[in-house]
Amino acid sequence: MDITAKTFDGQGGRDEFQRKNIAEKAIKLLKSNIDISPMVIDGSWGTGKTEFCHKLINLMKQDDTHNIIYIDAFKADHVDEPLMTVLAEIIKILPEGPRRKAFINRVLPAVRYTLKTVAKAGVSHLLRQDFADVANDFDEVIQKTADDSIDKAAELILKDHVEAEKSLKTLQTALTAIASQDPIIIFIDELDRCRPNFAVDMLEIIKHTFDVEGVSFVLVTNTQQLRASINHCYGQAVDAQRYLDKFIKFRFELSPHSQRHMTNPVLAANAYFYQLIGEKGFLSSSLLSNTLLKKFIAKFIGHQGLSLREIETLVLHIEVVQVLSNSNRFIPDEYIGYSLLRLVGVMLVCFRPDILREIRKGVVDADLLGDFLGVKKLPYLEEGGREIPEVCEFIMASLTTDFNENKVNYAISEDQQKKWNSYMRYVSYMEEVPYRDRAVAQILETANIMAFE
């Protein structure tokens, strides 16, 4: 389905992350008299910002109160002129006829001036480079003509300044006239993926050129990356957040949770994992309903902070393993531990191939795997204790005989191994702590399937 046509409800609609109410609140603000432009919809890469943006736009279009424009800044940054990008989209919403022609005629001076300024900057840069190469030969000539050049330069700067102010005023007046009939809301997406110069120029253009009544902007971006773009352009000495604050009036972060009003909120990524697995249907329902597997998926996604895009990557690789193994790697065995170890192999391929490379060399680093799974050390099991270890602790315990680097926090004594064996059988994780190389073999064999070995 075309992402631009996606909706929260209706035929083909979906709201699996329960974000419609977020969109409704954003729309309420955009329609209010509060000056919140530019507003930022913030979120990490892969959290579903673009899909949410299109669903919000389609929801808002139902009331037909605003002219709504969507700009994919990443696709537009090759033009290298944000002003042209925005104006071109505004022109598109005007019907063919006198109104569109009049608007184009009124904004042309500003466009011409912008292009002329860019061209001058390019020529000036080339002249400075040429001059630097032969500067020593022209010292005397420059000294004689310096005063005349300064006078002429000052005159040109003043003329350019007057022309700029005049062109800008004309452009803003034309925009105000258009927006007075139907307010304009411009959604600019993917600003965080643009070249730093284009992203910063877009912010400047929005603030200094499009700050007119009836025209609002919504930036859909990752502000952390936007700050990096600012530092790229102006240096690390610049406080990027304070610089950004000059351009943004209101910001909200797209929640990573799909169920936000519960004591234990559910991560959207966790819900998305089961949605994709269910849609594709390559894992059995009995396996998916296993308590330890569900706990492991939730623990790993939360610990790693996986994005929706990363969930898609993970599910794709699990499906690849199932296809290449004739559905023989993830099956509802008597013991779930083997499937979990194989799942660790898939996760290493997706997110930490560096650890996998070391394992292939024969280096099984307990600290690295523990950090990957969120286990700092194995718990000491008390005699008669009722506290059942967590699922990731079971996985680390099953690998204990394979660890050969940094294993002090994961070593199990003979007495402790008996207790681990008892717990493993109790929860149907595994019959006992495996012999050497047996557990790590599950990881490697699964990873090798994806390497076509």
Predicted regions and their residues:
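Walker A/P-loop-proximal flanking segment of P-loop NTPase domains
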Residues: 1-72, 429-453
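The catalytic "switch" region of P-loop NTPases
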Residues: 1-11, 15, 23, 59, ...
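Conserved nucleotide-binding/hydrolysis micro-motifs of P-loop NTPases
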Residues: 46, 75-79, 223-227, 257-261, ...
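P-loop NTPase nucleotide-binding core
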Residues: 53-173
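Conserved AAA+ ATPase small/helical "lid" subdomain
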Residues: 103-131, 135, 251-331
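Helix-rich C-lobe and terminal helical cap/extension of kinase-like folds
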Residues: 285-408
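Charge-biased C-terminal accessory regions appended to nucleic-acid-, cytoskeletal NTPase
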Residues: 374-453
